Amino acid sequence: MKQSSNVPAFLSKLWTLVEETHTNEFITWSQNGQSFLVLDEQRFAKEILPKYFKHNNMASFVRQLNMYGFRKVVHIESGIIKQERDGPVEFQHPYFKQGQDDLLENIKRKVSSSKPEENKIRQEDLTKIISSAQKVQIKQETIESRLSELKSENESLWKEVSELRAKHAQQQQVIRKIVQFIVTLVQNNQLVSLKRKRPLLLNTNGAPKKNLYQHIVKEPTDNHHHKVPHSRTEGLKSRERISDDIIIYDVTDDNVDEENIPVIPETNEDVVVDSSNQYPDIVIVEDDNEDEYAPVIQSGEQSEPAREPLRVGSAGSSSPLMSSAVQLNGSSSLTSEDPVTMMDSILNDNINLLGKVELLDYLDSIDCSLEDFQAMLSGRQFSIDPDLLVDLFTSSVQMNPTDNIKYTKSENKGLEATKSSVVQHVSEEGRKSKSKPDKQLIQYTAFPLLAFLDGNSASAIEQGSTTASSEVVPSVDKPIEVDELLDSSLDPEPTQSKLVRLEPLTEAEASEATLFYLCELAPAPLDSDMPLLDS
């Protein structure tokens, strides 16, 4: 064998070991010369390997053969059957052939496919992967903690929603009970009806609650159909007849001077008042299908109350109504009859008048004044806004105090009796007198309940009744004071609807005597200073 520097020492020693004849009993070429055989591994490892190599380990020899590309040859017939340990072992390489030692240069030791640089790069990549995995793990833990928090918050929110739903249902039940109570309160106490019937008190002995005076003039006629004389017809507007009670017509005239009003004398019969110059252009028509009476109209100079009622108007009147006409609904008899019977009649008359709009307006007051309502429920005592009571107890046809109202002064011409039906109207001289537009002075005496709720106590009402004769319509010699009364008393702002405000009464105001006095339910006969309209 030719020595070559390109052939590794292991291959040179192996070639020499196989070529020598004295070692053929341990290692030799195969029959075809393409491979070599190791006949006895144990003896070969103990006797031959130490001579050529520095070890006697057969496994190390086989490992070096594998490093140079030698492969162990396994025959088909013996591949399945396990060979004996001491049997021959054959190794083969494409460039290791018998008699071709020049091919040994082509046998190269296997070099690892990975380079150190590549190993470093792989290590860096592995570090990056590990760090990213750690970050992902941290994020996952954070997300899990957040998820647990969200779950707990969701559970608490659902609990709160269930509690709120229960509270809402309970509140709805409370509101439903409150509404039922208010409906009962309205039906029992008549606080809502805007069409509540009130007796018309036109006497001048009661204390005037406001500086509003009403002068009624009448003119006798022969039939039941009466017309209102007037110089201008454009001021009249027709209105639908709502009930069979007293209706006040307002005749708008712009051209009359202020004059004084004479005293209307009393008679023991039904009286008709006629005048040529009368204070306002107002006609009052009353249905006489039933025997209803109005109180006697008295002048400012008379201090004694009227004893005989005044029959006014007829149901057959066809005179037109103004846009500012006011309908006054009569009430049941409030004289000395049984209070329980009287209240039952009022309830029966007014329950049918309750409308949806009025009830809804009253129910809206719950949102405005819940604390006052609670105080009323606890003490079962309440008071009402006086401005609202004025709106409640007036007629359903609202009249703006600044619309189509004129102030005139006229003189009474005489009285004439009739028992059928009478219509009041003004004379032509009264229509020619000078007037103040948008203002009309009307005198009336309301219940003490209204006066009390407007801010006057019961004692003030009684004191006002004793001085009524001095506070009625001004006399002929004081026309300037009437103007001042008009300017100071009439509110130029339009009437606005108000809600009921319930306030607790004091102990003095809530006493039994005071409440009976306010409601005109005193068991004793009423004072002669307060004659009522028996309707």
From Swiss-Prot:
Query: Which keywords are on file for this protein?
Result: Activator, Cytoplasm, DNA-binding, Isopeptide bond, Nucleus, Stress response, Transcription, Transcription regulation, Ubl conjugation
Q: Where is this cross-link: Glycyl lysine isopeptide (Lys-Gly) (interchain with G-Cter in SUMO2)?
A: 2, 82, 135, 139, 151, 210, 218, 237
**What are the annotated GO cellular component locations?**
cytoplasm; nucleoplasm; nucleus
One GO biological process term is:
spermatogenesis
Region entry Disordered, spans: 298-325, 418-437
A Pfam family (short name) is Vert_HS_TF
Tissue specificity, please?
Isoform alpha is expressed predominantly in testis while isoform beta is expressed predominantly in heart and brain.
Name the record gives this protein: Heat shock factor protein 2
